[in-house]
Amino acid sequence: QEAKLPQVEIQEGSEKIEGKLKVTIDDSELCARYAARMLYNVKVGTSPFWMQQRLRKAGVRPINNVVDVTNYVMIEFGIPLHAYDYDKLAGHELIARRAKKGEKITTLDQVERQLTENMLVIADAEKASCVAGVMGGLDSEVTEETTTVVLECASFKGSSIRKTGRALGLRSEASARFERGLDSEGCVHSLNRAAQLLQQMGDCEVAAGVIDEYVHPQEVRRIDFTSQRVNDFLGTDISEEDMISILATLGFKTETHDEVLTAVVPTWRIDCTEMPDIAEEVARIYGYENIQSTRPLSNISEGQEGFEHAVREHISSVLSRSGLNETVTFSF
């Protein structure tokens, strides 16, 4: 059975995001996509009990409705979001760039951190407002006085986020996900889901439009395989139809060309890159308990003791019987 994802529908208001917020990607190597939505007439307060309860069960501490929704969507879709107080952004601008020499930022944990020039930050027109993918800045934090919010959902280079977090001695729920790589295609959908939840709570109005800078679209991967090759790999006898059905439940689309099958890998499965990965997915759903254990097919001959080894063992035995002690040391 295919997973049922939440249906996302938003009622956009009369105000438009166009002309009120500018987004720029200065470093496309470290930021492949940056999407933003704007919420106005925001009422910051506590989130509903059901959301707080679910967050706690996931090990996340509830803070306020805006932050809780971003964390909830992160758990729901696996894609981190971040919220800014729009009125605290100088120039009403967000720029994905590398930190400047000597630049500092005070993060949400109230610690001032020294940045280096190889770290990616999200900055406004004057200063860094967020350590990209790691933690937001205190200066742009959403508080009870906030009335207009900018929601961010972006795709950052995983290795860069990992190095930044390690250098700063800082690791967050967001950075742990960015480090492994994320589905760039899910950015706008995640933004819309967050806006929908806040709107359903009656805590905001949603500005019309989305700013979406997508400089490096995610490549769609296709993996060729045959049912025979997968069965040989697994030691099974699963029909081609069953394989196609199993892959379909996992979000893979399968195309047939002559006797070769081509699996179109879902964008969120960045771990699936070659035929053995397809075989693993088939085996996982088919059931490991349904795969019979078999002995490896190989001709193994009994080894013979070499002459030099026999002489060495004999000499060792003679010397030890004569009262000598043998010391076995490391080989390096």
Q: For each of these PLM feature ranges, what is it?
A:
Residues 1-332:
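Phosphate-rich ligand and nucleic-acid binding surfaces
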